[in-house]
């Protein structure tokens, strides 16, 4: 079993987006700690299976971030289940988890399931609209969510998601200071080695996604953060 607490860098691939064999090879051979498959819309059983089968040729951890029950399948090392803390719709707090347990509860290996306390911060992102997230958050709001995740819910991961834009470093820093047990994931807008280095100095783990499809060379440079420690 892999130890996710040792992961510093994750590449996130969207099964609804095309990636060439050469680019996928470069991503999987880049020394990233893991590959995560996940997306907001058009995530289907077929495109998840297709992408998973292409990645499974490589000896690195593979994660499915669950966005709908239809695309859940065996064959992943971990299943990340988001609970969107700032969603105004209870379905995104525990609805996916409830349906997953009703459907697969008898066969779930809970050692493979990681619950993420998600906070969506970009109002213009697809995920914010889809989850009906209240993104008008102050630093104090984020600190309170961090305390909630760390001390009350005791979730293993808190994911600060800016999805498409580079986040407010001071707010991410404030969250980090309130997490003593929970692992902090940051994702959103990382498009350069400099940004990756800046966020990796605060978050335990950075998630790099969109830039893969825009500039593969810049995406690969973000892995260099592993050469230094937090």
Swiss-Prot record:
Cofactors that this protein relies on: Mg(2+)
GO molecular function, one term: heptaprenylglyceryl phosphate synthase activity
A Pfam family of this chain: PcrB
Pathway assigned in UniProt: Membrane lipid metabolism; glycerophospholipid metabolism
Superkingdom of the source species: Bacteria
EC number: 2.5.1.n9
Binding site for sn-glycerol 1-phosphate: 12, 159-164, 189, 209-210
Catalytic activity: sn-glycerol 1-phosphate + all-trans-heptaprenyl diphosphate = 3-heptaprenyl-sn-glycero-1-phosphate + diphosphate
SUPFAM superfamilies membership: FMN-linked oxidoreductases
Example of a GO biological process term: glycerophospholipid biosynthetic process
Family that this chain belongs to: Belongs to the GGGP/HepGP synthase family. Group I subfamily.
Role: Prenyltransferase that catalyzes in vivo the transfer of the heptaprenyl moiety of heptaprenyl pyrophosphate (HepPP; 35 carbon atoms) to the C3 hydroxyl of sn-glycerol-1-phosphate (G1P), producing heptaprenylglyceryl phosphate (HepGP). This reaction is an ether-bond-formation step in the biosynthesis of archaea-type G1P-based membrane lipids found in Bacillales.
Name recorded for this polypeptide: Heptaprenylglyceryl phosphate synthase
The organism of origin for this protein: Staphylococcus aureus (strain JH9)
Lineage: Bacteria, Bacillati, Bacillota, Bacilli, Bacillales
